[in-house]
Amino acid sequence: MAAETSAQTRDIFLQIRAGSASGRIGVGIEGFTSPDTSSPVNIVHDTLIGDLNGSGLYQTRALPDSIASHNQSSFLKWTESGAAYYLSGALSGTGKSVAVKLYDLKTTLVTLDAEYLIDSKRPWYTAHVLVDDMIKLFTGLRGSCASQIAYISESKGGKEILIIDADGRNMHQLTFSRTTNLSPAWSPEGQRIAYSSLNGINWGLNVININTGQSLNISRWGGLNTSPAWCPTNPDLIAFSSNRDGNNEIYTCRANGTSVKRLTNYQAIDISPAWSPDAAKISFQSDRTGSPLVYVMNSDGSNIHRLTSTPNSYEDSPNWSPRGDRILYVVQNGSTFDIGSSSPTGEDLVMLTMGEGTNENPKWSPDGLRIVFWSTRLGGKSLFIMNWDGSGVRPLTSDGNSFSPSWAPAASGDDIRVSAKR
């Protein structure tokens, strides 16, 4: 029954994603509070509401009269409030954990039954992990609330890589090279970041361990090596652009720089590779027809074709949804740039930003529900997050010196989740 319920909820999500169903999935919440205003569980409650409403998938519903029991009568009240699901949280006697149950109000089945620790130093993380679990239950992919985002900042004595939690907390610097670093890209397991770094007259490819800070130059052949993209199904394979053979082409190599393979061979500039989630295809930017446009090829370099027939004058920064159903890219809009989304066949281009400064470098969240990008809409370059359909835009940074974001893989939550029954 749980599997059947999960399949039904995923159908609802797909309908919302495709535009055939309107609105968000209503969730009623009770519990997750304490009369002690200093209790960390109150922060869990507030964060939970923010995460659900900011997910692009859920919408919390107003609490009806207090419900004393989980029965048909109480479920009817929640249904009347517009909720499709009811989430209850019971604080443990010690206050150090919360027992959670998620009810399907249509079937009255418990679809999630789990216990989560509450870390008093970061109680919000409990809510992040819970919502990520709910998103996986509904969509098949873990949510992005507990994940991190790497980006470039110009405010640290150079262009350095920084990492920030997806909620804007815990910003910290990763590189201290005092040079120009660009295009950070996370490895599939989330422990390494590949990036391009200026070393003298050469642009090298580096891989850094985010735990130790140890960095390795993997492009010992010199020249211009940029825009690394880690293969989503192989933690030992990286696509990148290089002029090592005289012209900017797309290549792949192992994570230590060996086994270099050339994929494109054309007298044009080919850059910015991006893998499909199954690693069967790669999208990239090329000016082979005179203007920089987005192309798609098989991951072995065959069947190169333009993504869309739309008469754009400039396209850049393709990024494939982890669900495989959409490709983000940047389109020139007069003197500025905006972010669009189309299917992998190039159909139904939808503009997600329009008329609010320049908007570039879009990257999908690991659940395919949100997008991080940089924009000048507030002056300078700052990071913003929006929902997959362009709604709910909110700032992540505000320093005016942040760009080139990359969303990390989803966090497992195993350090917070004590037990789970589905």
Kindly label every feature range from the protein language model.
Residues A7-G23, K106-T175:
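C-terminal/domain-edge helix-coil "capping" segments
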Residues T9-K77, L87, L91:
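Short beta-strand->alpha-helix linker/helix-N-cap micro-motif
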Residues Q72-D133:
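Amphipathic beta-strand/beta-sheet edge segments enriched in Tyr/Trp
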Residues S97, G157-L162, N202-N206, N247-Y251, ...:
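Structural motif
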Residues G143-C145, P188-E189, P232-N234, P277-D278, ...:
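Residue-level detector of Asp-centered blade-edge/turn motifs that repeat once per structural unit
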Residues I149, G190-I193, L237-A239, A279-S283, ...:
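Hydrophobic beta-strand positions that form the internal "hydrophobic ladder"
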Residues D165-L182, I208-T226, C253-I269, M297-Y314, ...:
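Multi-bladed beta-propeller domains
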